[in-house]
Each structure stands twice: as structure tokens, then as C-alpha cells.
């Protein structure tokens, strides 16, 4: 890089690199015979025996002429389970737990765009430390979306800001062009699904962290509807971003993370 046409700005670009834990999914597994407790996208979760599949309560407006609010219940849809021991050291902040399993659920039917807290009402982030007695859960509603189980390899990766060139006073067109070429080399082609823990988010619309300096990306789950993937699509080729405050991360309060959906 230092010998390239952005040599004068190489140090600034290097300083802008953020480590990330890449969730590199493999081909969807037949059935759901992945090892109990293994990291995966889609399929069904392996929950501690004492934990039930999360069910949300929500209010729905019904009636053709005389509208009324009806409280309904329905299960959340399983997205991912990440075995914390699989996450490489140095790819995530030190406050991220090194034991247990992090689970992610979301209402894939109603697909809310903005969830204030992932506490089980529209989405859920759940970290379980005691995972010695796991059982493969049974989906409570066969009519809900079913996503193919994909084993996940968790690897150290790197990210760069996608919106702004991290170089002061760099209005050089050559530098900008090189940076655009560099981004997919560092963090993968733009059109490939990007699932990851931490690092710089690959925003589709505006930066949801721009006015929230105390927050960071926790988990990014991309649309992945190819035949080898879990088969989900968020809006028009969108992405789910789970965002968490540093204080909540340090205290393990994952249910206080918020969720943003962006799409094209």
C-alpha cells in the first residue's frame, strides 16, 4: 500500500482498520444435524433445558369498519447462535464474553425496522453462560419462516469505514478510487453477504451510529437468500444491525441492544 498512489495516507487508512469476527457460513446442512451447541446461522437453536423458545406479545389493529386493538402472541424467529469460545481473541472487544452462547432472534414476519431494545418483544439477544445441558429446540409454530441451518466458522477479519474516506483533507480522486478498490479486498465484495460481530458496519443508508458515540455495532446479519445460505431476505436486500452501548456490553446487558433494519 505504501508504494501505491495513496502512500501519503497509508498510515491514516491503517489506523482506521477495525477488527471484526467474521461469521463465515458454509453450505446449508441437510436437515438439522449440526453438532449440539455449534455456531450456526438458521436452523433451530440449541437452548439450555430451562430456557423456552422466546415468544413475543404484540398489539395488532384489526376490524374492517370498527377498528380495535388485539393483543397477540407469537414466537420470534431464530437467526443465529454463536459459541463464544469460537470467537478469536483480538477480533472483538475484551468485554465480549469468552464463554457461553449468544443467541439472536427476530420477528421475520412483521420485520420491524427499528427495535429500541432486543428484550424479546420484537427481537432478542440472549447470552447463556451455562450451556452444559443443551437441547435442540422444537419450533413452536410450523407456519413461521424456516431458515436452513448453516454451520459457521468464526474468523478474525478487518473492516474500514464505508461512507467516508478516513483520510484528512483527502479530496484526491486517485486516492478515493484506490480506497474504493481497497474496501472489498479488506472486507469482502460488496454484493456478498456480510455476517459479522463488531467492526465497522456496512451501512446501506445513513450511519445509525453517527450521533451515538457511546454505541457500537455488535452483530450484523445480512440478507442471504442464495441456495447455499439460510434463505432470508430483509426487505429489499437489506441488513440487520444489532447496536449496543459500551456500558451495556461491559455489563453483559445484551437485551438492551437495539436493532436497525436498512435496505435498498
Task: Describe every region a protein language model picked out.
Residues 1-264:
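Preference for intrinsically disordered or flexible, low-complexity segments
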